Regions:
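HIT superfamily nucleotide-processing domains
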Residues: 1-118
Length: 118
């Protein structure tokens, strides 16, 4: 089961098959911090979210969980409180291995639920 509608899931799978998916750190940021970028998720989970963005590291770590203390601190001490204060997003989440479609690049989903889930 996908969090995307059938149409968007088909577009995602086609882009994946064709090798057309952008590396997360190559997606143009809509906001930047020292270690992190906020980017729009082109293949959003549109069954649940009206807005679906991601926080991605500017660098690509060697393994999924290899974040530095500085990157973690910026995320939890600066970015999350700032986004929470704005009141625009409803959730932040990361996926464990069984649910990751991008398994080689640590990223956090930030999203706003569609009205029926609020």
């Amino acid at each position: 089961m996908s969090a995307r509608t059938d149409e968007l899931e088909a577009a995602y799978q086609l882009a994946k098959e064709r090798g057309e998916l952008q590396a997360l750190n190559q997606i143009p940021p809509i906001e930047e911090w020292f270690y992190w970028n906020r980017v729009i998720n082109k293949f959003k989970h549109d069954k649940f979210y009206i807005v679906h963005e991601m926080l991605v590291l500017k660098r690509k770590p060697r393994t999924y969980w290899e974040l530095t203390n500085y990157e973690i601190l910026e995320l939890f001490r600066d970015i999350f409180p700032e986004l929470d204060q704005r009141g625009y997003h409803d959730i932040f989440k990361g996926n464990f291995k069984p649910m990751r479609s991008v398994d080689d690049y640590f990223h956090i989903h930030i999203a706003t639920y569609i009205e029926e889930y609020r």
